[in-house]
Design a protein with these regions (language model features):
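Residue register of alpha-helical TPR repeats
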Residues: 19, 23-26, 46, 65, ...
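Boundary/linker segments of alpha-helical solenoid repeat arrays
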Residues: 13, 59, 104-106, 150-152, ...
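Terminal, low-structured helical/coil segments at or just beyond the last alpha-helical repeat
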Residues: 175, 179-205
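Conserved alpha-helical positions within TPR/SEL1-like repeat arrays
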Residues: 22-37, 68-83, 114-129, 160-171
């Protein structure tokens, strides 16, 4: 079904690109997810690369409408690149995703901060895997700060995200030789996890 939709959109884009390019990009991004779940990593990568190309051109024409889609598609590109073993290109893709998410959140925090925080957390992990200690530490701090801001407004939605970001931050601090800071941050994360477990237990009665 996805292939049929893409074939139709390709024909429409060839004859009248303006109203149909976004539909083709969206269909390719959906196909990427389906191929990835099916273990067809190289086909998924080809599909998402094409989708990113379309979203880049759309975002140049209408940034407000399509930069969020470009960021989401770049995130999928990073995942696909990692799946085929290209960690360097995956890191570049997630860096670009984070740069776009930062820009969007700066302009409209209420709308875009919920996507920025987990993006920064993922970038922290990628940077750590690549051995970029200083940058991973800086990004971990940024991720925690983004989650703290979200938790102040919606603790039930973002509390566990903050706990996870704190765990990662503690690991990076430990890697950087900041043992005391790492212990303090890890303790905060554990306390949040215990509070959530107690809350869930109470609700279960």
């Amino acid at each position: 079904m996805a292939w049929e939709a893409i074939d139709i959109y390709r024909q429409l884009v060839r004859t009248n690109p303006a109203p149909h390019t976004a539909d083709l990009a969206r269909a390719l991004n959906i196909l990427t997810l389906n191929l990835s779940r099916a273990g067809r990593a190289h086909e998924a990568l080809a599909a998402v690369q094409e989708a990113v190309t379309f979203y880049r051109s759309l975002a140049q024409v209408d940034p407000a409408a399509y930069k969020p889609d470009l960021a989401a598609c770049l995130h999928n590109l990073a995942t696909c690149l990692s799946d085929v073993g290209d960690r360097s290109a995956a890191l570049a893709a997630i860096r670009e995703t984070a740069a776009i998410r930062r820009e969007l959140a700066e302009r409209d925090p209420a709308t875009h901060s919920p996507a920025l925080a987990p993006c920064l957390h993922r970038l922290t992990k990628r940077l750590a895997e690549a051995g970029h200690r200083g940058e991973s530490l800086q990004t971990a701090r940024e991720a925690v700060a983004a989650y703290r801001s979200l938790v102040r407004r919606r603790p039930e939605d973002f509390g566990q995200g903050l706990a996870g970001a704190l765990r990662t931050y503690a690991s990076v601090l430990e890697w950087a030789g900041k043992e005391a800071d790492a212990a303090r941050i890890r303790q905060e994360s554990e306390a949040m996890t215990e509070d959530k477990a107690l809350e869930d237990s109470i609700r279960g009665f």
